[in-house]
């Protein structure tokens, strides 16, 4: 198995726990039954997939049936023909970003411009604050009082939360470890505290915790060039290209 195939297999496997999995060949949809947030609902094409217009429309039907925006996330090198079919079907590219990886010996602790900062594993009492910080940072609204926050610790994942004087400032999570691989996800910093090195600090802390839990390789996808530079300073380097596509809102 090539490194790209290994990483795509990992991303497919780690998407399954806690989600409704629906096959729509050559796609597999991973749908959160409790959260319509676009970034936690997506599909992954089979390696080497070459879908036609009918296949894309079947995928759309699956997402719409579940009240979710049709989306895809995959490694370009694993299925390079998919993007052409999506263009022809009227979908759009949300994001093209490097897939970056880091091994334990690569990890670098970040310098942080915040005094009295604490970074600790997320526990039961932190779940709502963690979820709200991530949602607001990604342009969504806080959870409704009746909504239960996702627990990043479910199925063997985890998260770390940075605080100052009790105030939650930044968070990073990691997915369940599969064959020694985990993904750092949900890295978010509260808007007033950005630009102080917190994203790099929680990324490094999350990766270190994942390595301690048994991972031998951490991967992540930066949202933009600035994030890529932040993660590079923490020891991550590009290995492939991640594509994020969706229907227009």
Residue spans for each PLM region:
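N-terminal charged segments
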Residues: 1-65, 78-79, 83
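Short amphipathic alpha-helix that is part of the acyltransferase structural core
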Residues: 1-9, 43-44, 50, 97-99, ...
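A conserved beta-turn-beta hairpin within the catalytic core of GNAT-like acetyltransferases
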Residues: 35-42, 94, 176-184, 194
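Acyl-donor-binding surface of acyltransferase catalytic domains
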Residues: 50-125, 245-247
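Conserved acetyl-CoA-binding loop-helix of GNAT-fold acetyltransferases
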Residues: 52-60, 185, 189-191, 195-212, ...
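Conserved GNAT acetyl-CoA-binding A-motif
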Residues: 66-75, 210-223
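Conserved active-site alpha-helix within GNAT-family acetyltransferase domains
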Residues: 79-93, 200, 224-241
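A conserved beta-strand-loop-helix scaffold within acyl/acetyltransferase catalytic domains
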Residues: 142-190
């Amino acid at each position: 198995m090539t490194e790209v195939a290994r990483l795509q297999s990992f991303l497919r496997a780690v998407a399954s726990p806690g989600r409704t999995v629906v096959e729509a060949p050559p796609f597999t949809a991973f749908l959160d039954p409790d959260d319509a947030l676009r970034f936690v609902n997506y599909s992954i094409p089979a390696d080497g997939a070459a879908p036609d217009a009918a296949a894309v429309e079947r995928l759309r039907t699956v997402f719409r049936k579940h009240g979710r925006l049709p989306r895809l996330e995959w490694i370009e090198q694993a299925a390079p023909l998919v993007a052409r079919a999506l263009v022809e079907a009227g979908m759009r590219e949300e994001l093209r970003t490097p897939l970056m990886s880091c091994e334990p010996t690569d990890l670098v602790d970040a310098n942080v411009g915040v005094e009295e900062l604490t970074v600790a594993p997320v526990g039961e009492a932190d779940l709502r604050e963690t979820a709200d910080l991530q949602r607001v940072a990604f342009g969504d609204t806080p959870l409704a009082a009746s909504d239960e926050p996702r627990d990043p610790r479910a199925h063997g994942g985890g998260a770390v939360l940075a605080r100052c004087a009790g105030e939650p400032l930044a968070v990073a999570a990691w997915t369940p470890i599969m064959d020694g691989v985990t993904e750092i996800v949900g890295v978010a910093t509260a808007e007033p505290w950005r630009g102080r090195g917190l994203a790099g600090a929680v990324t490094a802390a999350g990766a270190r915790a994942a390595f301690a839990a048994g991972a031998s390789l951490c991967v992540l996808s930066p949202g933009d060039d600035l994030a890529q530079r932040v993660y590079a300073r923490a020891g991550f380097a590009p290995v492939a290209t991640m594509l994020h596509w969706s229907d227009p809102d």
